[in-house]
Amino acid sequence: MPKRKDIKTILVIGSGPIIIGQAAEFDYAGTQACLSLREEGYEVILVNSNPATIMTDKEIADKVYIEPLTVEFLSKIIRKEKPDALLPTLGGQVALNLAVSLHESGILDECGVEILGTKLTSIKQAEDRELFRDLMNELNEPVPDSAIVHTLEEAENFVKEIDYPVIVRPAFTMGGTGGGICYNEEDLHEIVPNGLNYSPVHQCLLEKSIAGYKEIEYEVMRDSNDTAIVVCNMENIDPVGIHTGDSIVVAPSQTLTDREHHMLRDVSLKIIRALKIEGGCNVQIALDPNSFKYYIIEVNPRVSRSSALASKATGYPIAKIAAKIAVGMTLDEIINPVTKSSYACFEPAIDYVVTKIPRFPFDKFGDGDRYLGTQMKATGEVMAIGRTLEESLLKAIRSLEYGVHHLGLPNGEEFSLEKIIKRIKLAGDERLFFIGEALRRDVSIEEIHEYTKIDLFFLNKMKNIIDLEHLLKDNKGNIELLRKVKTFGFSDRVIAHRWEMTEPEITELRHKHNIRPVYKMVDTCAAEFDSNTPYFYSTYEFENESTRSDKEKIVVLGSGPIRIGQGIEFDYATVHAIMAIKKLGYEAIVINNNPETVSTDFSISDKLYFEPLTQEDVMEILDLEKPLGVVVQFGGQTAINLADKLVKNGIQILGSSLDSIDTAEDRDRFEKLLIGLKIPQPLGKTAFDVETALKNANEIGYPVLVRPSYVLGGRAMEIVYNDEDLTKYMEKAVHINPDHPVLIDRYLIGKEIEVDAISDGENTFIPGIMEHIERAGVHSGDSISIYPPQSLSEKEIETLIDYTKKLASGLEVKGLINIQYVVSKGEIYVLEVNPRASRTVPFLSKVTGVPVANIAMQCILGKKLKDLGFTKDIADIGNFVSVKVPVFSFQKLKNVDTTLGPEMKSTGEVIGTDVNLQKALYKGLTAAGIKIKDYGRVLFTIDDKNKEAALNLAKGFSDVGFSILTTEGTGIYFEEYGLKVKKVGKIDNSDYSVLDAIQNGDVDIVINTTTKGKSSEKDGFRIRRKATEYGVICFTSLDTANALLRVIESMSFRVQTL
């Protein structure tokens, strides 16, 4: 069926900020879909709230709205634009839920907007747990014994019938939000109310646990002709019970018999047909390992995390084709963009193994609950491709950037066998590595299977790796064995360790005996059709399919998996750098390993290598491609950390030199530079050990800010108030990196300012200066940023421009530089300088209209700012205000403290833009998920040093009609100054404690500032966690709470007597 001619404009809803469970895969899907629809001649209107996305670039859609994803704002846009149709299946759960809400609000009927692709009835049937269960019963497809509950009492009644354990799955949520496995009554009482709270329809499915079954996924496509195909089948190495986003996944499935595969394939196609889904869909099935018995777990009637993985694993662009199906085209008339000769109705075939491993945030949150269950905890993922499962698995492991390079932990020998077994039984994020350690201690695969229910096939493959390790140890220098272990994915680093040699010695030995990787093409068809996809992976075989062209080449290093501190912003910068390189006529080559991102879409660059970002893997590609140079500025700390290794191997780093990077990071060199430039910085010193740290801190004077050098996202950064805390910190930090000292700075209380600038080696241009709402001490990535700054004087702005130009010139920057300043007592100090892309690049690009990364890349390649039209020091400011608001995923991470400080904790960001600060903040806070009400109840629980500032804040809330609740000490202080409050009792020794108030829904906002002391049992910690778990807004910075108050004041009218 040809595409529809009766519709001209299509509204596409994006997925909003990155949170755990919904990451960059939707930027990739949305970008593909928008371009695909425009290719067919439709006008595309895009709405998303996340500035750090390629899909919100003006080039991707005809009209782009960066506005909050709420019914209120979407209704305004629909009334203004009057689109013919809405496409909701490419923006994850957020877009699906919004489509349902928009339909129910009546706006779609009012404006005559049709929902494209999968119909609303099908979405509801797949998402509503009750309707889905009824459909499966109708189709005679088995689902676990289950009940739909709307109250805790209903849940208790169901458990009496079937007994524990039960799995709780809230309706219309993603990433397992609010769900979990209940083993007893205590779990049930915690998880069910939580799940009901997070479900927008206040509904949970309780089902008999089938944990331990194999979890198999089928990624399927269907068109309006009822043609349906399987794009990819995937197998979770971790069995049912661990969320698929937290599982290690392989494609194609490895342990299914032909009969099992065809049985589950047929079931998946039957379900997608019954649901009448038009587009992509993910079917999750639980298979009994000992029989042909299976259960349907769930269906996602949309593009998902799994579809991004399936697209990258097979090369089949699911989102692009789903968009064409949505406008009426059929699979047999859509050309496969990879082969350019076959049609999209041909099922992809793959002749390699793909492994996906999730990336967890527990290097940031050491105190977090690492147990994995049905609620997702990973922030990102890596993917690797190999010809054997062992090769694919080991390549994925070394892509993770945990400091782990193999199947085991760096300090594995320090663990007792008892501890290892305990960690295997507890399904945590490090279980894979503990399995490696157990195999090294000769624990049998049968015993490990008993603890984990991981299939013996996978455990056997892991045992192969350990057996080869032992062989290496016993056969030092054996060249044939060297050749063999390379085909199984062993890195030179691991071989060097086993042979007691250095990594360069192993590399040299390999090259001498011509043991080099070849590069194979990912072509969707296992070489059945001619294909010229520029998408490659390495393996140790014979025929190389990546031929070097004669064109001058530039290699861009990507930023690897998404994690806290290094998010999608760096992928955004990478994609813009690639576009600039292509525009200037060079061949753009990307090396990256993140399956969720736009940079790993093979149609973006001239060549894509899907490889680990390690010295060995990158150098082999560079040896083959022989580029003019490598760009490390846009790949975050991942790429920066490779710079010195590449330079030692004779590779040219383009843009700011290694020396510039080192000067900015090395305390002594940087201090000398600042003295020479006459730019002040807070008093600071360095230390390698506890003794020196204590001496230096006492000379500087507490409080001090301590951090390791060469880190991103404020990792391991703290404000320390005394010797005892500093001693604890040093013991932990020295463990973080023994090669670089700990930096100790005087902590200045003041206004934090952030500046991004572009330099061409001679001149410097500043796209924008941003002011943070939270004072210095809160990590810049967790602060609300305002552009343009609202409280800086003309003189301060002139000083900031002057310092920025001097620093760019002094560091000989070519490309981007990010500088953080603090304004304290009238003086401007430099806090930190990074000669690379920062996480504010997308935000500034969107609000100023300056394509920051693109211009920077052109400067790196020799263009001059004045020739590109940038002749001023700073960009002109428009007549609007924009705010960047951080978004957190605390509800998914148990036991993580929500207090904001110098270590970054946010996973994503949104933007709010309007004519004044209050309106911009309203939009930004709303987009971040904060429901702003003009009345309610605020709970204050404040430490002594903040009580005075909190009093003014409480008075402000009281003036606009909020009731003030307090804990005892705070209440007494507020009452002394005439403020009327209601006091709630202390934790554990009161009939109505502060925790009861939160749990009973008697509090709308919590404002809590911390008392010093790190124990998780501290009252403040328990208050903050309770607020997070019950979905109550919790502010730990008075500055952020004050910003909310300003918004509420602008919405309200004060009432007062004469």
From Swiss-Prot:
Catalytic activity of the protein: hydrogencarbonate + L-glutamine + 2 ATP + H2O = carbamoyl phosphate + L-glutamate + 2 ADP + phosphate + 2 H(+)
Protein name in UniProt: Carbamoyl phosphate synthase large chain
Matches recorded under NCBIfam families: CPSaseII_lrg, PRK05294.1, PRK12815.1
Keyword match Metal-binding: yes
Upper taxonomic lineage: Bacteria, Fusobacteriati, Fusobacteriota, Fusobacteriia, Fusobacteriales
Cofactor: record remark: Binds 4 Mg(2+) or Mn(2+) ions per subunit.
UniProt keywords, alphabetically: Amino-acid biosynthesis, Arginine biosynthesis, ATP-binding, Ligase, Magnesium, Manganese, Metal-binding, Nucleotide-binding, Pyrimidine biosynthesis, Repeat
Domain (MGS-like) ranges: 930-1058
Spans annotated as Allosteric domain: 930-1058
Ligand binding (Mg(2+) 1): Q284, E298
Residues that bind ATP 2: R707, R746, L748, E752, G777, V778, H779, S780, Q820, E832
Binding site for Mn(2+) 1: Q284, E298
Taxonomic source organism: Fusobacterium nucleatum subsp. nucleatum (strain ATCC 25586 / DSM 15643 / BCRC 10681 / CIP 101130 / JCM 8532 / KCTC 2640 / LMG 13131 / VPI 4355)
Assembly and binders: Composed of two chains; the small (or glutamine) chain promotes the hydrolysis of glutamine to ammonia, which is used by the large (or ammonia) chain to synthesize carbamoyl phosphate. Tetramer of heterodimers (alpha,beta)4.
Sequence positions that bind ATP 1: R129, R169, G175, G176, K208, I210, E215, G241, I242, H243, Q284, E298
Entry cofactors: Mg(2+); Mn(2+)
A biological process term (GO) from this entry: 'de novo' UMP biosynthetic process
HAMAP family recorded: CPSase_L_chain_A (MF_01210_A), CPSase_L_chain_B (MF_01210_B)
Stated family: Belongs to the CarB family.
Cited function: Large subunit of the glutamine-dependent carbamoyl phosphate synthetase (CPSase). CPSase catalyzes the formation of carbamoyl phosphate from the ammonia moiety of glutamine, carbonate, and phosphate donated by ATP, constituting the first step of 2 biosynthetic pathways, one leading to arginine and/or urea and the other to pyrimidine nucleotides.
InterPro entries for this protein: ATP-grasp, ATP_grasp_subdomain_1, CarbamoylP_synth_lsu, CarbamoylP_synth_lsu_oligo, CarbamoylP_synth_lsu_oligo_sf, CbamoylP_synth_lsu-like_ATP-bd, CbamoylP_synth_lsu_CPSase_dom, MGS-like_dom
Domain ATP-grasp positions: 133-327, 671-861
Residues reported in the UniProt entry to bind Mn(2+) 4: E832, N834
